[in-house]
Amino acid sequence: MTKSEDIIKKTEHYGAPNYKPLPIVISEAEGIWITDPEGNKYMDMLAAYSAVNQGHRHPKVIEALKEQADKVTLVSRAFNSDNLGDWYEKVSELTGKEKVLPMNTGAEAVETAVKAARRWAYEHKDIEPDKAEIIAFNGNFHGRTMAPVSLSSEAEYQRGYGPLLEGFLKVDFGDVDQLKDAINENTAAILVEPIQGEAGINVPPEGYLKEIRKLADENNILFIADEIQSGLGRSGKTFATDWDGVKLDVYILGKALGGGVLPISAVAADSEVLDVFTPGSHGSTFGGNPLAAAVSIAALDVLEDEKLAERSRELGEYFQDELKKIDNPVIKEVRGRGLFIGVELNEDARPYAEALKEEGLLCKETHDTVIRFAPPLIITKEEIDDALERIKKVFS
């Protein structure tokens, strides 16, 4: 038995079966490359679901981590830490919003946005108590906690977890008329992934986000975007909503906000929205801790200094164009923006993900028939060409 096999056996024995990973063990990683205990190297084409946009162990992020770890790592929000204000300022300037609320995981940030939207609706829109509604979209994925699960349109994500939370409506992604019909006097917010990730990298019709912005303005509704996966350069722009040139009322950020090192998330909005929270009404022991703030500042500096959004846009266009040239009837469609790419197949995608793993390329199927290619944004054209050769070998 190899070391990897022994590790997998132990993991499956002691761990709850809530994941079905590819049969590989990762012991080291740097840049876009991953190494298993046997010394085999693989190209990372998943980037931890876009949490590793800056690449594995980016030197500037690791330097910030080590430097801060030698000072102070956690004080809780019972006290002020010396770098939290700097991080707030960084995220505020990035989003153009007045206030920031720090959390840890993306799901926590979604829960925060839902709570903020509901309280805002009661305090600023005078919706009757306990009647506020939030509109989401079929195919959405906002996390695994109860609000995101209740928002979901996937029966399997909800099975056995009832009673679900009330006050959530779902409409088809990209259908303006359905959205118009769903809006009523109790609508507090519209929550959208500007590119649906887990649903198979679904890009909305051109101008759709502008229509949402218009409807939100006309009806005094908060426009909230979950940019946890699609944001911070992944789509080829800082935020995927930038493709339609729209500004949001609420940004939900996560994943790459932590530079591939720590779980760091945030909700950014103007004072009218986030000032609905009062001391004790919401919080997190670890949210905005000194270590997280230092790492996230460095992670955002890397995104800006290395122009990773522009890099994603240019290389993503090239990658997609080359994928579209692969002549195989099993490939139904290649779609995406930047280095956020989905290859939809006419059959189950899992065997192809496993075959790509054997060729030294790590990716993952999503929504059964879609292979997601979302490498760290530091990838080079030469490395993309290398990946394309491996992909062509599997699909030849």
Curated annotation (Swiss-Prot):
Pathway in which this enzyme or protein is active: Amino-acid biosynthesis; L-proline biosynthesis; L-glutamate 5-semialdehyde from L-ornithine: step 1/1
Cofactor needs: pyridoxal 5'-phosphate
Documented EC number(s): 2.6.1.13
N6-(pyridoxal phosphate)lysine sites (modified residues): K255
GO BP annotation list: L-proline biosynthetic process
Gene3D superfamilies associated with the record: Aspartate Aminotransferase, domain 1, Type I PLP-dependent aspartate aminotransferase-like (Major domain)
Matches recorded under SUPFAM superfamilies: PLP-dependent transferases
GO CC term (a single one): cytoplasm
GO molecular function, one term: identical protein binding
Entry keyword set: Amino-acid biosynthesis, Aminotransferase, Cytoplasm, Proline biosynthesis, Pyridoxal phosphate, Transferase
Catalytic activity as recorded in UniProt: a 2-oxocarboxylate + L-ornithine = L-glutamate 5-semialdehyde + an L-alpha-amino acid
Transferase listed as a keyword: yes
Major place of residence: cytoplasm
Cell compartments where the protein resides: Cytoplasm
PANTHER family, A to Z: AMINOTRANSFERASE CLASS III, ORNITHINE AMINOTRANSFERASE, MITOCHONDRIAL
Task of the protein: Catalyzes the interconversion of ornithine to glutamate semialdehyde.
Family: Belongs to the class-III pyridoxal-phosphate-dependent aminotransferase family. OAT subfamily.
Descriptive protein name: Ornithine aminotransferase
Protein source organism: Staphylococcus carnosus (strain TM300)
